[in-house]
UniProtKB/Swiss-Prot annotation:
PANTHER family: UPF0102 PROTEIN YRAN. It comes from Methylobacterium nodulans (strain LMG 21967 / CNCM I-2342 / ORS 2060). This is UPF0102 protein Mnod_0024. InterPro entries: Restrct_endonuc-II-like, tRNA_endonuc-like_dom_sf, UPF0102_YraN-like. One of its GO terms (molecular function) is nucleic acid binding. Belongs to the UPF0102 family.
Length: 129
């Protein structure tokens, strides 16, 4: 069996590509709202942040979720994901000390087929260390 014949490998690749597409769509939606990208797929401290965006004095750490429905996307951010996300956000802040004086928040963008992405401001609190 070749790699392309493996159904599990095909599913993983499709999921990976769907995630990248959702992140690009989320980025476009946020750009149209006046945000500037600072980082994409920032990984550190056992967590990952899909997008780090800035608008004025706000730094938004953005989790992008693509699911069949917007409600399913919202439900996909569980406590474990929030903890890992918060660890990565603290690592990003430590590497960018200039950001400490700005408003920092955790946003989410939910993406569903044939729908414009939904941006949820302050979707959850960044957990302290």
């Amino acid at each position: 069996m070749t790699r392309t014949d493996d159904p599990a490998a095909r599913r993983r690749r499709a999921t990976y590509l769907r995630g990248h597409g959702a992140e690009r769509l989320a980025l476009l939606a946020l750009l149209l709202k006046g945000y500037r990208p600072l980082a994409r797929r920032f990984a550190a401290a056992g967590g990952e942040i899909d997008l780090v965006m800035r608008r004025g004095s706000v730094i938004a750490f953005v989790e992008v979720k693509a699911r069949p429905t917007l409600d399913a996307a919202a439900a996909a951010i569980d406590a474990r994901k929030r903890r890992a996300f918060s660890r990565a956000a603290r690592a990003w802040i430590a590497r960018h000390p200039w950001s400490a004086g700005l408003t920092l928040r955790a946003d989410a963008v939910f993406v569903a087929p044939r729908r414009w992405p939904r941006h949820l401001v302050s979707a959850f609190d960044l957990e302290p260390s």
